[in-house]
Amino acid sequence: ASLYERNGLIELIKKTAKEIFIPLTVGGGIRSLEDVAAILAAGADRVCINTAAVQRPELISEVVKVYGSSTLVIAVEVIKVSEEYMVFTDNGREHTGLKVSDWVKKIEELGAGEILLTSVDREGTGRGIDIELLDLVRNCVDISIIVHGGIGSYEEVFNIFHNLDVDAACIASLFHYDTIYSSENLDRSVLGNKSFLLSNKKRSGLESISVKSLKDKLKS
C-alpha cells in the first residue's frame, strides 16, 4: 500500500512528533519524493526506505538532492543463503537477487547517509548480532551503520558500542519484552525471526500501547 492508503499514518506521525523529544525516523510505504515530503512535513526527522530503493535506486539520489544525505536511511534486510549474504525485502520474504556487498556500495555511491542493517536470521532471537555480516558491510562502506537483529541483553548493547565499529543500534524485542512487559517466561526465540515471519502466526504476546503510556513506562 502507498503512504496515502494507510489510514491515519500522517496523523500518527504528527501526534508522535509532538509527544516525543528524540529524533523520529519513519519508514514503510515510502515510494516517492512526494511521500518523503509528506512525512518530513508531518514532523519526522528522517525517512527510512527499503523496497522502493531496491526497485528504483535513483530514488536515493533524488531524496538526497532535495533533503540531504542525513535525512535518508536505507534499510537493508539480509538473509544468509548458501554462505552468501543476500538482500531481501518485505520483512525477509522477497529475495532480490542482490548481494549485500554490491547493494551497500551502491547505496553509498548514491548518497544515502545511513544504513539500517538487519539480520533477518537473528531478528527477534536474542542470540546476538551477526558480527560477520557487520564486518562485511563495514569493509564495504564508510557511511553510518545502524546494526539491527539479535540484540538480547543490555550487556551486549554496551559491548556493541565499545568494541565494534558501528554507529548505532536498533533495539526492539529487548525493550518490548524486558522493559515494558518484564515477561521472564516469554519465548522470544520464536517471535520476529525468519521462521516466525514465514509461519504467518500472530504476535499474541504483544499488546497495543499508546505513545504516552510507552513514555510513562520507560520513565518508571
Identify the role of each PLM range.
Residues 44-122:
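Conserved anion-binding
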Residues 54-56, 81, 153, 176-179:
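Short gly/pro/ser/thr-enriched loop/turn and capping motifs at secondary-structure boundaries
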Residues 1-6, 82, 95, 122-127, ...:
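Short, small-residue-enriched loops and turns at beta-alpha junctions
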Residues 60-67, 159-220:
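C-terminal helical cap(s) of enzyme catalytic domains, especially alpha/beta-barrels
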Residues 20-25, 30-47, 132-171:
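Catalytic cores of alpha/beta
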Residues 28-29, 49-52, 96, 118, ...:
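Glycine- and other small-residue-rich loops at beta-strand/loop junctions that grip anionic moieties
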Residues 3-25, 59-77, 126-153, 211, ...:
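Alpha-helix-loop-beta-strand connector modules within alpha/beta enzyme cores
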Residues 10, 33, 56-57, 97-101, ...:
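Structural motif corresponding to alpha-helix initiation and N-cap regions
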